[in-house]
Each structure stands twice: as C-alpha cells, then as structure tokens.
Curated annotation (Swiss-Prot):
Mg(2+) 2 binds at D180, E216, E220. Binds 2 magnesium ions per subunit. This is Ketol-acid reductoisomerase (NADP(+)). HAMAP family: IlvC. InterPro entries: 6-PGluconate_DH-like_C_sf, KARI, KARI_C, KARI_N, KARI_prok, NAD(P)-bd_dom_sf. It catalyses: (2R)-2,3-dihydroxy-3-methylbutanoate + NADP(+) = (2S)-2-acetolactate + NADPH + H(+); (2R,3R)-2,3-dihydroxy-3-methylpentanoate + NADP(+) = (S)-2-ethyl-2-hydroxy-3-oxobutanoate + NADPH + H(+).
Length: 333
C-alpha cells in the first residue's frame, strides 16, 4: 500500500451500493476513482456526482484498494479479464459479498490482500445515514492477508462508509456468504414471498375478496416487519392485540413446524455444499431459462394485479398530495 491509513481507492461499479460507497468514502477524505465501462448506463451519474470516471482497467492500475461492487455473476470475468492483469502488486481487493471467492469462482492473486466489507443496509440507507452523521452497521472479513495489514484496511474502509458510527462485526467469507444466501432464500425473499402468496391463495380459495386478502397478508406485513426491525419479535408482540398474540403462539408453530425447519436445513445444506451456486451458475450461463419462467409466474400471480389496483389508491406511495377528486363511493377499492 502506498499509504497505510488513506489508500487510493477504485470503486468498480456504480449501482446502489457503489454510489453510496464512493460518495461516503470521498466525504471521509479518501481519493476515490470510479471505474466503469465507457458509455455505460451509470457513467453520466458518476460524472454528475463529481467523480473521475475511467475504464475499470485504468482505475485499478494506481489504486491501493479496489472494491468490486458489480453484480455477482459478472465478477469472475471482470476479475480475470480486467482486474487481475492490471492491479498493482500488493494492493487490496475488496468485495461486498463473498460468493465468488468462497465458492472458488475467483482465485485472487497471491500477492493481494483480499477482504470483505458489507454494510447491512441498502445503498440509499448507507448514504442517507452517513449524511445525517450516523452510520449503517458493517460486517467485515479477511480472506488473504499478504501484507499483514489487510484487517486494518478493511476496518478503515468500513469506517469511511460510516460503519464505525454504528457497529462493525468481524466475520468470515464463508459465514457471510452462506448466511446471506440462506437469509435471502429461506426467510427474507423466498420464504416471505412464498408465505404471502400461499396465505393469499388460502383466503381467496375460501371465498374471501382478493382485496381483503391482499390487505391482510401483504399490505399489513410492513407494520409487523417495522416492529421487528425496531425491537425484535418481542416488540412486535407488545404492539399487537392480545388476540393477535395468542394467535401467534398457537398457530405460528402450526404453519412453521419441525418439517419446515427440516426443509430449511436442506436449503442451508445446498448452500453450504455449493449445490445452489453450481445450479445458479449453470442457469446463468444457459441464458436464464428457468429464472425467466419463475419470474414470469410471479408477475402473473393474482396477488400482483390486485396489489397494483390497491396501491394506485395509496397516494402516500407515489408522492401525490391528495387523492383524485372523486365521490367517496367511487374511491372504494
């Protein structure tokens, strides 16, 4: 490294996280260059934000620390074709997700430090919290410490994002990758969306109005998740009725029982042994035929059409200040 405390940083990618990282690090006093494909969709945005934007191959040449903040499935080719041939000796390679390294799709050069820094929040939140003087918690890991200073640089980077204002927790590439994938698949995305769809179907098939079903199983979910977010499950239970609490206690375990937990363990096993990643890479390389089919099925689920109509009347969602001037009986969903 050319500077032990203030490395020259190249941010490769300028999506939600890339933009937040670049802006926060620059505001923290770092020399930041953004590496993007010339003429790409985010080049003008980065330039408008005041960054020097060059091709990734140029950005990495003089950087002490290179942060790869592109989508997972383009990182292997990007590293092999652009980053590895051009990164200077002894620099630090940083990831925000460990999938490619942990599952051996990327084998970093032996002379590089290799670390991970992952804010636990979307890019917009990472930026917003930084701007108001707070920060989003970060996790970090060291995969390869050639210089003996890899951990220091991971912590410096996390601090530059604002993570030190909140909380920084050490992990490993293995732990971050496997728990992140499991959370997405079994709970946050796959589990939650399948639970909502199933609940909607049960109510509609029992003869209830689709609009009422939507409100009960999807719309009100935000109220519960916000309470989870603020204070855990116990806070949620404090703010719902005793009837809802009792229903939670007696019916929750009927829906999510030992057999559900066993299947969740199967999901985790497929993640741990690389089956999921192997299948995902094969799917991507085949042109995403199943992914496209699954996505279309979700788009065509009845809950989507119902939700679209109901959300059109939720003026707070689209920034409108008042509902359309129509008689009250015409405003009903």
């Amino acid at each position: 490294m050319s500077n032990d405390t203030q490395p020259k940083i190249a941010i490769i990618g300028y999506g939600s996280q890339g933009r937040a990282h670049a802006l926060n690090l620059r505001d923290s006093g770092f020399d930041v260059t953004v590496g993007l494909r010339p003429g790409g969709p985010t080049e003008s945005k980065a330039q408008a934000d005041g960054f020097t934007v060059v091709a990734p191959s140029e950005a990495v040449k003089s950087a002490d620390l290179v942060a790869i903040l592109t989508p997972d499935m383009v990182q292997k080719k990007l590293y092999e074709d652009v980053i590895a041939p051009n990164m200077k000796q002894g620099a630090c390679l940083l990831f925000a997700h460990g999938l490619n390294v942990h599952f051996d799709m990327i084998t970093p050069r032996a002379d590089l430090d290799v670390v991970l820094v992952a804010p636990k929040g979307p890019g917009a939140l990472v930026r917003r919290e930084y701007e108001i003087g707070r920060g989003v918690p970060c996790i970090y890991a060291v995969y390869q410490d050639t210089s003996g200073k890899a951990e220091q640089f991971a912590l410096t980077y996390a601090g530059g994002l604002g993570g030190a204002r909140a909380n920084i927790i050490k992990t490993t590439f293995k732990e971050e990758t496997e728990t992140d994938l499991f959370g997405e698949q079994a709970v946050l995305c796959g589990g939650a969306s399948s639970l909502v769809q199933a609940g909607f179907e049960v109510l509609v098939e029992a003869g209830y109005q689709p609009e009422i079903a939507y409100y009960e199983v999807l719309h009100e979910l935000k109220l519960i998740v916000d309470l989870f977010y603020e204070g855990g499950i116990t806070r949620m239970l404090e703010f719902v009725s005793e009837t809802a609490q009792y229903g939670d206690y007696v019916s929750g375990p009927r829906v999510i029982d030992a057999s559900t937990k066993a299947r969740m363990k199967d999901v985790l096993t497929d993640i741990q042994n690389g089956t999921f990643t192997k299948n995902w890479v094969a799917e991507y390389e085949a042109g995403l035929p199943n992914y496209t089919k699954f996505k279309q099925a979700d788009l065509e689920h009845p809950i989507e059409e119902v939700g679209k109509k109901l959300r059109a009347k939720m003026v707070w969602l689209n920034g409108e200040q008042q509902a359309a001037a129509a008689p009250a009986n015409q405003q009903a969903a």
